[in-house]
Amino acid sequence: MLSIHDPLLIFTDLDGTLLNSHTFEWQPAAPWLTRLHESGVPVILCSSKTAAEMLQLQTTLNLQGLPLIAENGAVIQLDVHWEDHPNYPRLIAGISHNEIRLVLHKLREKEQFKFTTFDDVDDQVISEWTGLNRAQSALTRLHEASVSLIWRDSDERMAQFVARLNDLGLQFVHGARFWHVLDASAGKDQAANWLIEAYRRQWRARPLTLGLGDGPNDAPLLDVMDYAVVVKGLNREGVHLRNDDPQRVYRSQNEGPDGWREGMDYFFSRS
């Protein structure tokens, strides 16, 4: 089991994991977040959300100043104390949001793929799609290194679309509710490994890592963790890990923040 006194990093997905997928409630996890904060354990948020959205969430969760992984790993917000880093305050993996927009525009124009991106609609429509208020919806549109969209074509056409993207050095990632196009070099796992190495240098010791996630797109992140909590989710595909050893992986009975708390209780119950 883990100890709160270990050199430790916690990486967590948001929607469906730390946050309830429908209500965005996080309060069941509050006692653990407080304990981790008081013990100086970094809790690193990982999501398809934009950095602007996640910085606001960090403040709500009392995690401000810590690193975060946004846009499925295409953006890393650096620790507030790393201002000497040449890319401070954010690292961007691969090509920019505007460059990806241009690629998608050309593909849609040339091959008539059917999809609707967040850039195609206004804040009101985003609010209807997500259940967020208008101010929060505006933050979801502030992508820096990815494009979020709703796919409106057939599975066969999707396979063709993915092949075109791959040829252009891009990938198509399915999140909790939307699809995301980002550079093929980006990923939650690559971003997590970068941060683990940064903390190893800072602490002069390799951190132990615990990751929490609920969907198939969290598997790459959980695969690079020392320990993992698979929070019970709504996705029928489930979460398939390369190493599903029960000494390393706990699968919760509860969903969302209740499952998050359950997983933390499990790994730290003997600390």
UniProtKB/Swiss-Prot annotation:
<dbReference type="InterPro" id="IPR006381">
    <property type="entry name" value="HAD-SF-IIB-MPGP"/>
</dbReference>
<keyword id="KW-0963">Cytoplasm</keyword>
<feature type="binding site">
    <location>
        <position position="15"/>
    </location>
    <ligand>
        <name>Mg(2+)</name>
    </ligand>
</feature>
<keyword id="KW-0378">Hydrolase</keyword>
<feature type="binding site">
    <location>
        <position position="214"/>
    </location>
    <ligand>
        <name>Mg(2+)</name>
    </ligand>
</feature>
<feature type="binding site">
    <location>
        <position position="13"/>
    </location>
    <ligand>
        <name>Mg(2+)</name>
    </ligand>
</feature>
<dbReference type="GO" id="GO:0051479">
    <property type="term" value="P:mannosylglycerate biosynthetic process"/>
</dbReference>
<keyword id="KW-0460">Magnesium</keyword>
<dbReference type="GO" id="GO:0016791">
    <property type="term" value="F:phosphatase activity"/>
</dbReference>
<dbReference type="GO" id="GO:0050531">
    <property type="term" value="F:mannosyl-3-phosphoglycerate phosphatase activity"/>
</dbReference>
<feature type="active site" description="Nucleophile">
    <location>
        <position position="13"/>
    </location>
</feature>
<dbReference type="Pfam" id="PF08282">
    <property type="entry name" value="Hydrolase_3"/>
</dbReference>
<comment type="similarity">
    <text>Belongs to the HAD-like hydrolase superfamily. MPGP family.</text>
</comment>
<dbReference type="InterPro" id="IPR006379">
    <property type="entry name" value="HAD-SF_hydro_IIB"/>
</dbReference>
<dbReference type="GO" id="GO:0005829">
    <property type="term" value="C:cytosol"/>
</dbReference>
<dbReference type="InterPro" id="IPR012815">
    <property type="entry name" value="MPG_Pase"/>
</dbReference>
<protein>
    <recommendedName>
        <fullName>Mannosyl-3-phosphoglycerate phosphatase</fullName>
        <ecNumber>3.1.3.70</ecNumber>
    </recommendedName>
</protein>
<keyword id="KW-0479">Metal-binding</keyword>
<dbReference type="InterPro" id="IPR023214">
    <property type="entry name" value="HAD_sf"/>
</dbReference>
<dbReference type="GO" id="GO:0000287">
    <property type="term" value="F:magnesium ion binding"/>
</dbReference>
<dbReference type="InterPro" id="IPR036412">
    <property type="entry name" value="HAD-like_sf"/>
</dbReference>
